[in-house]
Every structure is written in C-alpha cells, then in structure tokens.
C-alpha cells in the first residue's frame, strides 16, 4: 500500500475545497434564482389575456382589492416542489399569519385525491372499475330506474361524472347542526338537506359535474374496507405520499385547529364556526396545505414519467390524466378519472378547482412536463386564484398557457360596422364605443370589457382566452360575431346581429319595470311555450346571477316573477326565500320556505334554512 505524499495530500485538500466552493456557489445561485422567481410571481398577477404594455399587480394589492384574508401557494418546477409560501392571515381575530403549514379546506379539489384512493383499491384487486357499483355497495344501492335498465352505474362513471347522478350537490353543515350519516345523505332523509341521490340520465350518455357522484364512491369504500373514510384515505394516499399536514377528519385535533384557516364570506364576515362541516368527505372534505397538495400532484407527475413507484401504479395513474367517455361541448376541458384536463395546443394540464363556504382552491399542473401550482384561499374569489396561476405560468415560462398580444388600432369603418346588439341563445350581447374604445358586454352585466384588435381579423378581451371575429353573412351580408377556439381556430359559437329596437323581456327588469317584464314573459310563454328563455330553470339562473353579484333588488324581482309564472313549483319559492334571507327580509323568507315545504315536504334544504331562521328570531 502506497503512503500519500505531502504533495498529494495538498492536492486532495485543494480539490475538496474547490468542490465545496463550487457546491456553495451552485446552492447560492439556485437560491438567488428561486428568490427572483418568487418576486416575479408576487408582482406578476395579470388578466386571462395579457396585452403588451399592460401593468401587472402584486399579490398584496390583489388580496386587498378582493378582500382576501389569506392565501397559500405551492409552486412545482422540474417535477419537484420549488417553493411554498403563505401570505396574509389565517384568522382576523388572532392575526396569525398564513404559513406553508396552514390548513385550508380543499373543497372539490378533494375529488382527484379520492379518485386516487379508489384506484389504489382497484390495484389491490378489491374493486373493478367497470363493475356495477351496486355489486360493492351494502348499506345502500344506486336506485334502479328507467335510466339504469340497459346500462348500470360503474365506478368509472362516478369518478368522471358520467353516471347521470342527480342532484348536483349534497350541501354542508354548521358545527351546531345535526350532522347526517352518509346513508341519510344518500337517501335524502332528515337531517340531510339534499334530495335523494339517484340517476336521471343513462350512464355514459353525457357528463355532468356533480359533487354527489362521489358520495356513492365514499360509501362503497366504507362497505368494502370496513374502516372510516379518514382511516382508509390515510393508509391509501396521505401516509404513502407524506401528506403529513392533511386529514379527512371533520373534527380537527387541537394541534391542527391552531393551524387551520378560518373561512370568510365575500362580504368579509366569518363563516359560522370558522368553516362548514362536510360529511360527504369524498367530494369536498379534505383539509390540507398547498404544499401537501403539491406533494400529491408531483407524485402523479413523477409516476406518469416513470420516476416514482410510490403509491399508485403508472397504468392506473394514466387513467387520471386521459380523457374518458363523452365530453361536454360547453366545457373548456375534458374529464379523466378525478382530474379535469385542459388541452392548450397539445399541452395537457391537470386542473381542478373547488368552492366551499369561505374557502376556494385551484390547482393547475402540466401532466407531462413537471410544473404546476396550488393556490388556496380562505375566501371565495376565483379570479384571484387564476391571476396567481397566470403569474406562475409567466414567471416559469409554461408552454402555451398565457396568451400575450399586441394591441392593433381599429379603423373607424370597422367600428361603425360592428357596433350593435347580438344574440346568442338567451343572451343579448352589446358592442359599443366609449371614449374612443370598443367594449362588449352581456346586457345582464353592469360593466363592459374592452374589445381589443390583435390582428387583421381577430379581437380579444382581457378576461377570455377565446378569439372574437366579425364577418358578414354569406346570404344577407349582415355582420355576425363569432367565438373562435384559440387552439384549433374552429368556430365555437355564432352570435347573430339583431335589431336594436327589439327588447328582451329581462331588459324591463333591468329598467325597474316589473309589470312590463311580467307581461313580456307571459306573452312569450303563450306564444312560444318551449322558448328556452321562459323556462323555470333559466329564469332561476338569472335570479342567482343577480344574487351572486349582490344586485338584490333585481334578484328578488326575478325570483318573484318566476313564482308568478310557475306557482306550483317548490323550487321557485325556495329561491325567493333564499334571496329574502340575504336581503334581511326574514318574515318573507320564512313564509316562502314554508310554501316550498308545503309543495314538497321532502325539501330538506328548506326545512334546515327555516329552522335556522326561526332559531334567530
């Protein structure tokens, strides 16, 4: 054995020192790069379409603009979590800051996690995705009816919302409410506030997003395994993926209670009990952090890329990231088993969002390229989450995500040709000039959006990714408006120009003339009973649009009009009562909830709301 010389020892020490210095510099360089990227995100919030020369916003300013108390962000880059950070406060009373360890309600972003858990049971040969789910259900069965004669509801149908499940949601509960069991929710029996879960479409006929689709999945997992849903999901998902700050328990431990965010309504008031209880845990019951959820996303990405064998197999994980079954032509996404899938010029993004009372969460991650982001807030302003996602996309150079355009001057001759009113189904759209700029707006909206020319024939709006084009009709030469798909440039909608003197019945409501509006709707109903604008559901949707925009007089008048047109429907009285409650008209709310119950004694939602109002008297 040769003894090292002094010279060799000196060379070795020098080499080790240089290696240490290189690693230190590399580490410092990576840290600096991360700090720069974080700053770009924090100051890069922008609109859905970015116009060159537009300024951007900071996270702090937009939180203040919307009135959002706290937000947690986790950014994924190169298949790993690049950073996670909190902003603002988790509770207005304690002023405790949001950190990366603060828990938020994941809301409907729970569904991909549940789907992952169900697929792990498939992997263990306890379930078959294409089997009739009633083969596994013991405590309850999907009701057999005319829609399940030919096709049975499968696990796969439920995971991607193609089962034809009704109703859409199952509701949430205050901490002092009587909380229903899962079987009571499935049967729609008191104290559950939802209608019974059933099917009203044939499986695979269409896709219809429904929280209620995941309630049979939860019951199936309970019946197959025998433990609580929280215990099952801990073993199948949370523990293997090291999601150590996550739980499906609706009663949090004292330690987690200290770190949970308090939910706030859009008016800034606190949700009673700091947040609602969600016994339908499979659809919206997960408590988690942005960082923990990012661990879930990176596992899916790494598994799909063959870089991880932790948790679910690659073959089954692929089912989460591939479109399954029919698609909904009105959606900008397709559905895998759990995730929504967005195709941006063949770049596939895994996406989901969720809204619980006082909480909003959204995730966006490239299926194949190892980048993404999770944004969670303790208030409900979806556009803020979208602005943060766009800031991350811009800072980290995501492929085909954020459209950027240069503004082109609009000729006077074009302005004169395209201004006017256009009609799409039940919607009237106005194109008008104001202050040397073009604007477009739905007549139900208060404000318009600037219409920006970006090429010889294409226009955009800052809040919509689709293109707009104006072209003359081949037969009569009349200018029509077209919505153009950004990916393949196909026409998605044709909006016909209409006479500016013809009024839509809803315009009388907007002008405050209730009697004229009622007469116009009655006339339309008599002349065209099948007209889509006269249906109970459409008018109800208009009422809720005003309701969510806090235009309460319009909301009340719309629901009132619907009651007069459809006096035998329990739903119209329920909606009017809800608006009365929000407007502080407690006596009217009680009266109309009672009327709704009189018409439908099984309206558990109305019964619960009525009890809440009567308690407060």
Segments and roles (model prediction):
Residues 25-85, 170, 222-227, 231-235, ...:
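Catalytic loop of the DD-peptidase/beta-lactamase superfamily, centered on the K-T-G motif
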Residues 56, 105-109, 121-170, 219, ...:
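Active-site helix/loop module of the DD-peptidase/beta-lactamase fold
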Residues 62-72, 94-157, 198-212, 281-284, ...:
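Short active-site loop at a secondary-structure junction
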């Amino acid at each position: 054995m040769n003894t090292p010389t002094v010279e060799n020892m000196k060379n070795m020490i020098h080499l080790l020192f240089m290696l240490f210095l290189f690693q230190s510099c590399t580490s410092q360089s990576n840290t600096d790069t991360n700090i720069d990227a974080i700053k770009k995100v924090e100051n890069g919030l922008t609109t859905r379409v970015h116009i060159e020369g537009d300024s951007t916003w900071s996270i702090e300013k937009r939180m203040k603009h919307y009135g959002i108390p706290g937000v947690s962000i986790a950014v994924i880059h190169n298949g790993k979590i690049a950073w996670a950070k909190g902003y603002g406060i988790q509770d207005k009373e304690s002023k405790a800051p949001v950190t990366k360890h603060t828990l938020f309600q994941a809301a409907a972003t729970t569904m991909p996690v549940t789907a992952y858990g169900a697929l792990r049971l498939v992997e263990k040969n306890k379930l078959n995705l294409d089997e009739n789910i009633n083969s596994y259900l013991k405590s309850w069965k999907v009701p057999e009816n005319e829609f399940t004669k030919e096709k049975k509801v499968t696990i796969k149908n439920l995971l991607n919302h193609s089962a034809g499940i009704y109703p859409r949601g199952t509701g949430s509960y205050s901490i002092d409410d009587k909380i229903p069991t899962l079987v009571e929710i499935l049967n729609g029996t008191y104290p559950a506030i939802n209608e019974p879960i059933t099917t009203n479409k044939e499986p695979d006929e269409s896709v219809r997003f429904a929280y209620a689709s995941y309630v049979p999945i939860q019951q199936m997992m309970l019946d197959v395994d025998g433990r609580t849903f929280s215990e099952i999901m801990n073993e199948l998902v949370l523990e293997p993926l090291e999601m150590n700050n996550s739980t499906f328990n609706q009663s949090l431990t004292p330690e987690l209670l200290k770190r949970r965010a308090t939910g706030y309504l859009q008016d800034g008031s606190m949700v009673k009990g700091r947040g609602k209880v969600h016994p339908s845990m499979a659809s919206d019951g997960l408590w988690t952090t942005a960082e923990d959820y990012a661990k879930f996303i990176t596992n899916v990405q790494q598994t799909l890329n063959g870089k991880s064998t932790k948790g679910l197999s690659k073959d089954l994980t692929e089912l989460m990231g591939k479109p399954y079954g029919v698609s909904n032509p009105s959606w900008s996404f397709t559905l895998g088993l759990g995730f929504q899938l967005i195709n941006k010029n063949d770049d596939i993004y895994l996406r989901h969002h969720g809204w619980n009372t006082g909480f909003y969460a959204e995730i966006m991650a490239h299926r194949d390229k190892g980048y993404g982001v999770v944004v969670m807030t303790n208030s409900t302003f979806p556009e803020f989450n979208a602005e943060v996602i766009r800031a991350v996309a811009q800072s980290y150079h995501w492929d085909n995500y954020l459209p950027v355009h240069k503004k082109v001057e609009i000729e006077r001759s074009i302005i004169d040709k395209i201004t006017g009113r256009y009609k799409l189904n039940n919607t009237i759209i106005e194109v008008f000039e104001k202050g040397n700029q073009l604007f477009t707006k739905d007549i139900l909206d208060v404000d318009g959006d600037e219409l920006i020319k970006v090429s010889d024939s294409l226009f955009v709006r800052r809040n919509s990714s689709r293109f707009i084009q104006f072209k003359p009709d081949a037969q009569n030469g009349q200018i029509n408006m077209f919505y153009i798909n950004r990916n393949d440039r196909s026409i998605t909608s044709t909006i016909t120009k209409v006479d500016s003197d013809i009024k839509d019945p809803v315009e009388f409501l907007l002008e405050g003339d209730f009697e004229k509006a009622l007469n116009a709707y009655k006339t339309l109903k008599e002349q065209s009973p099948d007209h889509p604008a006269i249906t109970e559901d459409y008018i109800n949707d208009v009422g809720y649009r005003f309701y969510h925009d806090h235009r309460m007089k319009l909301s009340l008048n719309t629901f009132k009009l619907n009651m007069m047109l459809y006096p035998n429907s329990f739903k119209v009285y329920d909606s009017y009562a809800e608006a009365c409650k929000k407007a502080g008209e407690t006596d009217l709310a009680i009266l109309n909830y009672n009327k709704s119950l009189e018409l439908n004694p099984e309206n558990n939602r109305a019964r619960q709301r009525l009890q809440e109002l009567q308690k407060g008297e």
